[in-house]
Amino acid sequence: MKEFVAISSLESPEHAMRKDPRIISVQWFIGKRCNYDCSYCSPFIHDNYSSHIDYKKAIQFIDNLDRHCTNQGKQFKISLTGGEPFVHPRMLDILEYISSKPNCRALVITTNGSLPLEMYTKSLKWVTNLTVSLHLEEGDKTTKSTVTKIIELNKSNRFINVNLMACPGHFDTVKQTAKQFDDADVKYVIRKIEPPTEDFALNTKTKKEGQTAVKNTQEHAKEKKAHRNYTNTQFQKLLTTYYSEDEWNYLQSLENSEKWQNMRLWHKDSSFTEIHSDELKRTMTNSFKGWVCYIGIDSINIEADGTVYRGVCLAGDPLGNINNDLVFPEEPMICPIGWCTCLSDMVVRKSSTEEYRELIE
């Protein structure tokens, strides 16, 4: 891959046409409650008992965000994740309210695809992008049902895309499903799973009498940051021990076959290359420690307890909480993280030095 010195996003026409997109991308981890229990998913980010976010508090934050955007002359793109967002009893009401705000440029939600087709179809009245993470540990019957729903939803005029999770031991299903998606013209990415590094025994995903959470947000943030600072060698070792040799070779053989590109790599001569962020992860060129990064300016991340950070990486101090005062940053920051592994953080504007900021400003 040709050396690059800056990055900008292609996640919307505004991002593609303007160096400063004037859009705040909001990643909102709206709740831990989930109806799946994937082996590779941290107990901190999913369980079957956490309370749903209070509807009134959710509406209050949406109003505050819309007001901030008006004051800044910006719009917002908001992405809801979990847990499983659709298990919230008022999720459709929340989606409708978000879409009604004047500054809402895009509304994205990620789901495991397990809810009824009718619910997803109704959500498309307000959602501009529906992302389905297809997990393969739920059995063939569930997988086939979810694939059928995905293909049906893909007939809508909304942007539907799939994260086809490359689960160890299920690569025959991965390949078969990929062919089905190719035949149905479904946009998808075969997503390499990041091996878990924390001790799952420290927390539990199932409700027990008298149970209290072992970890709080701050403790989990430390673990998350430590994981991002793994060296190339450490990360490579994790992956090659998580997957079998054949599975690993298959993942390494995949080319950048996505049907859309979501980021622009800028080179020293001001030329650029458009690729998908997964290609950076595949080639392990997603380390930006020491770069100037615009998380907090172009993006914010909200954790399950309402704590707000600049990005999903949790770099820097918290900006506040959606239930209290929230101070938006005015300047980009120097990246302190070893590896940028979340798509939403990877596509945020960044430059290797101050010299190359002009490419993205």
What do the PLM-derived regions correspond to, one by one?
Residues M1-I24, F44, S287-Y294, S299, ...:
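Flexible mid-to-C-terminal extensions adjoining Fe-S/redox cofactors in radical SAM and related proteins
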Residues H15-K57, V312:
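Canonical Radical SAM [4Fe-4S] cluster-binding loop centered on the CxxxCxxC motif
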Residues C34, C38, I109, G306:
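Conserved, mostly hydrophobic/aromatic
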Residues D37, N48-S50, V87-P89, E118, ...:
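Short catalytic/ligand-binding loop motif for oxyanion handling, primarily in non-cytosolic enzymes
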Residues S42, R67-C69, L265-H267:
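Glycine-rich short-loop/terminal segments
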Residues I53-I62, E355-I360:
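Short cysteine/histidine-rich metal-coordination sites, predominantly Zn2+-binding motifs
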Residues I59-L80, H88-F181, K187-V189:
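Radical SAM/AdoMet-radical enzyme domain recognition
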Residues N129, S133-D298, A304:
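Radical SAM enzyme [4Fe-4S]-AdoMet core and its adjacent flexible, acidic
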